[in-house]
Structures are given as structure tokens and as C-alpha cells.
Amino acid sequence: MLRFTDEHEWLRLDGDVATVGITAHAAEQLGDLVFVELPKVGAKLTKGEAAAVVESVKAASDVYAPLSGEVTEVNEAAVADPASVGTDPQGGGWLYRLKLDDPSAMDELMDEAAYAAFAK
């Protein structure tokens, strides 16, 4: 299940763990990414809380926790090569994995069609 937020994050659910990243739209708006800061594994995040930072030559932008949960894994490759987040944001450029407190909360987020209309 793939869902999107109005802050331009995407989540892909596998069981009760969601992989989180920025959308292609957000990556396009930011331009070339030069720095990525990710949350610590084990961190408890609350929906709406700043969880990560992506920085481009244009601007630094917070990435917000789309839902509440615990960080189970971070993408160290994204830290080592921030440009990968911009070139493959919904693939190899994922940011972190979040064990959701309530996986059913995914239903509150936008599906791909709704996000496409929102991002226009």
C-alpha cells in the first residue's frame, strides 16, 4: 500500500512497517540534494514531528513524520549519497523505516491519484 502526505512524503507499508521518503514532486522542487540528516534508529516519532532534514543548493527542508511510530532502520546510502534521494526518491532514495503505532492510520493519507491532484 502506497500513500502520500500533504507535506510531500510517501509511505509504502509492509506489514506494520512503513518505508518513508520524499516524493518525486518534492525532490524536483528542491533540486540537487547535498545533505541528508536522518532520525536515529529506535527514535519514537509523533505524527507531524520533524523527523529528517534534506538540504539542497536551494534550501533546507524538514521531512515530517507522516504517522507515529518507532524508527527501525535508516538508509545510510542516502546519507552517503544525498543526490540519490533526488534521483530515485521513491526507490533507492528512501529515508527511513517506521514501525507504525497504528497501521490503520495509513487510510487517512492520500492515495496516488489524490496526491497527483494535490501536487498540481
Swiss-Prot record:
Job of this protein: The glycine cleavage system catalyzes the degradation of glycine. The H protein shuttles the methylamine group of glycine from the P protein to the T protein.
- What superkingdom does the record give? Bacteria
Annotated HAMAP family: GcvH
Pfam families noted in UniProt: GCV_H
Q: Which co-factors does it depend on?
A: (R)-lipoate
What interactions and quaternary structure are annotated?
A: The glycine cleavage system is composed of four proteins: P, T, L and H.
UniProt name for this protein: Glycine cleavage system H protein
Residues with PTM N6-lipoyllysine:
K58
Listed A to Z, the keywords are: Lipoyl
Q: Which GO cellular component terms, listed alphabetically, does the Swiss-Prot or TrEMBL entry include?
A: cytoplasm; glycine cleavage complex
Q: How is the cofactor bound?
A: Binds 1 lipoyl cofactor covalently.
Gene Ontology terms describing biological process: glycine decarboxylation via glycine cleavage system
Domain Lipoyl-binding per the UniProt entry, residue ranges: 17-99
Gene name of this polypeptide: gcvH
**Record's family?**
Belongs to the GcvH family.
What species does this protein belong to?
Methylorubrum extorquens (strain CM4 / NCIMB 13688) (Methylobacterium extorquens)
Asked if the keyword Ribonucleoprotein belongs to this entry, the reply reads: no
